[in-house]
Amino acid sequence: MTKLENPVLMATIGGAQGLRGEVRAKAYTADPSALGDYGHLHSMDGRSFEVLEIRETKNVVIVRFRGVNDRNAAEALNGLELYIERDNLPDEELEDDEFYYADLEGLEARDDKGASYGTVTGVFDFGAGDLLELKGPGKRPVLIPFSEASVLEIDLEAGTLLIDPLAAGLVDDPEELSKFTADKPKKKK
């Protein structure tokens, strides 16, 4: 049983394919057929899966794992999410302006005046472009576009995103920015 310290979601199993124990899976990698190149995949309940074969189809990959030899065993994996340890992702292949979604989660979103708009709690792609989910203390989560106009700078070492709250849709009017500033004037008693 393996417990991952910094898990990164790589695929979700969708169901059995055929009679030999193969499964259909949605891969969350740039190259879906490279799913097995990252080493063993792990479930959150501690199981480990070694990819023996993988082939691409139109919307999913068909995967055969060691030890999953029949349809019943494959069906038992339906809906299972598979992860790898963050350290297994190849950082040297990233360009300066490329990031893994997993590295963005936990960053604090701030504007140029230092006001905080929350922490990145998720990164989503619903088809029209990537979105960042921000959650602040006592606030409901909000989604902002992950675009050059909204996210001006990413500093992984400092743990921050520099955002433009107007472009991100967090405020409708530039004058509203003053209510988010870090140094709010205190009310007189």
From Swiss-Prot:
First-listed, main subcellular location of the protein, grouped into a coarse class: cytoplasm
Q: Which InterPro entries match?
A: PRC-brl_dom, PRC_barrel-like_sf, RimM, RimM_N, RimM_N_sf, Transl_B-barrel_sf
Q: Which residues form the PRC barrel domain?
A: 95-177
User: Which domain of life does the UniProt lineage start with?
Assistant: Bacteria
Give the subcellular location. Cytoplasm
Q: Name one GO biological process term.
A: rRNA processing
Q: Name one Pfam family in it.
A: PRC
Q: What keywords tag this UniProt record?
A: Chaperone, Cytoplasm, Ribosome biogenesis, rRNA processing
Record-level GO cellular component terms: cytoplasm; ribosome
Q: Name one GO molecular function term.
A: ribosome binding
**Coiled coil ranges:** none
Can you quote the domain comment? The PRC barrel domain binds ribosomal protein uS19.
Give the UniProt family note: Belongs to the RimM family.
- NCBIfam families on file: 16S_RimM
* HAMAP family for this protein: Ribosome_mat_RimM
Quaternary structure and interacting proteins, as annotated: Binds ribosomal protein uS19.
Record function comment? An accessory protein needed during the final step in the assembly of 30S ribosomal subunit, possibly for assembly of the head region. Essential for efficient processing of 16S rRNA. May be needed both before and after RbfA during the maturation of 16S rRNA. It has affinity for free ribosomal 30S subunits but not for 70S ribosomes.
Put simply, this protein is called Ribosome maturation factor RimM
Please name the taxonomic classification of the source.
Answer: Bacteria, Pseudomonadati, Pseudomonadota, Alphaproteobacteria, Hyphomicrobiales
Gene name of this polypeptide: rimM
